[in-house]
Amino acid sequence: MKIELAKKYGFCFGVKRAIKIAENTENSATIGELIHNNEEIDRLHKKFGVKTLNDISEITDEKRLIIRTHGITKDDLDVLKSKNKELIDATCPFVKKPQQIVEKMSSEGYDIVIFGDKNHPEVKGVKSYAKGKVFVVLDVSELKNLKISNKVALVSQTTKRIENFTKIAEFLMTTTKELRIFNTICNATFQNQEAAAKLAKKADVMIIIGGKNSSNTKQLLLISQNFCKNSYLIENENELKKEWFLNKEICGITAGASTPEWIIKKVVKKINTMC
């Protein structure tokens, strides 16, 4: 069986930057999970003493605090700034972009529509910068019953699919007089999704490596399943099953933006020993 990696996969700029920050900030604590990958978070804890706090209420005697890649809410940031702590911001620059857009456009009187998951930490952070009305939706059907003004600004969670974002934009074009569209989907996300789709079209089995709570990794799984029914999401090599590869000729592999190369190599090695 041939094993083929997607042309684009794995660590994005924002995650690489955050990992480097954490490694250079030993014996610190992150506010929320730094990235959505349990294996890498465990490595940072064991090797560099970087622990994870669920939220700011858990802060005690920590002297150095790291803001997660997904960012935090404006209120939480203000609280952190008021504390006598060293604050290191690992928020991805591409996540800060929709935060800034939402703050600016809402201050200019625009209703804000965010395409994303309302429970995702990135979306919670972006939403908190709105000064007026803000709506979070995942599809067009959710927009139909909302009372939105004729002056709207649209942004997206950085890890969402461009096709679905476009559908939201097209609908709003027919219902508003003034619409400002900001494509805040990360370019690395788009490239990884495109590469996964291309590989899944020819693969007999697809392995997607990443955190099961990772938005961009789950998107890769959904995309792969559109073209390859034998698509599986795993966090590490121990979750692989031999029967997945029986009578298969091509195994495609891709990985989420928070998946380190060392995990990917372990998965490839394990598949080689199984086949």
Curated annotation (Swiss-Prot):
- Which reaction equations make up its catalytic activity? isopentenyl diphosphate + 2 oxidized [2Fe-2S]-[ferredoxin] + H2O = (2E)-4-hydroxy-3-methylbut-2-enyl diphosphate + 2 reduced [2Fe-2S]-[ferredoxin] + 2 H(+); dimethylallyl diphosphate + 2 oxidized [2Fe-2S]-[ferredoxin] + H2O = (2E)-4-hydroxy-3-methylbut-2-enyl diphosphate + 2 reduced [2Fe-2S]-[ferredoxin] + 2 H(+)
Cofactor mode of binding and number, as noted: Binds 1 [4Fe-4S] cluster per subunit.
Q: Could you say which residues bind dimethylallyl diphosphate here?
A: H36, H70, H120, S214, S215, N216, S258
User: Which Enzyme Commission number(s) are on file for it?
Assistant: 1.17.7.4
Instruction: Summarize where isopentenyl diphosphate binds, as residue positions.
Output: H36, H70, H120, S214, S215, N216, S258
- Entries under Gene3D superfamilies matching the protein: 3.40.50.11270, 4-hydroxy-3-methylbut-2-enyl diphosphate reductase, catalytic domain
> Which domain of life does this protein belong to?
Bacteria
Q: Which residues form a coiled coil?
A: none
- Write out the catalytic residues in the record: E122 (proton donor)
Q: Which Pfam families does this chain map to?
A: LYTB (PF02401)
Q: Which residues cross the membrane?
A: none
Q: What class of enzyme is it?
A: oxidoreductase
Give the molecular function GO annotations. 4 iron, 4 sulfur cluster binding; 4-hydroxy-3-methylbut-2-enyl diphosphate reductase activity; metal ion binding
Q: In which pathway does it act?
A: Isoprenoid biosynthesis; dimethylallyl diphosphate biosynthesis; dimethylallyl diphosphate from (2E)-4-hydroxy-3-methylbutenyl diphosphate: step 1/1; Isoprenoid biosynthesis; isopentenyl diphosphate biosynthesis via DXP pathway; isopentenyl diphosphate from 1-deoxy-D-xylulose 5-phosphate: step 6/6
User: Which HAMAP family does this entry report, sorted A to Z?
Assistant: IspH
Q: Which family does it belong to?
A: Belongs to the IspH family.
> PANTHER family, per this entry?
4-HYDROXY-3-METHYLBUT-2-ENYL DIPHOSPHATE REDUCTASE
Q: What does this protein do?
A: Catalyzes the conversion of 1-hydroxy-2-methyl-2-(E)-butenyl 4-diphosphate (HMBPP) into a mixture of isopentenyl diphosphate (IPP) and dimethylallyl diphosphate (DMAPP). Acts in the terminal step of the DOXP/MEP pathway for isoprenoid precursor biosynthesis.
Entry protein name: 4-hydroxy-3-methylbut-2-enyl diphosphate reductase
The gene name reads ispH
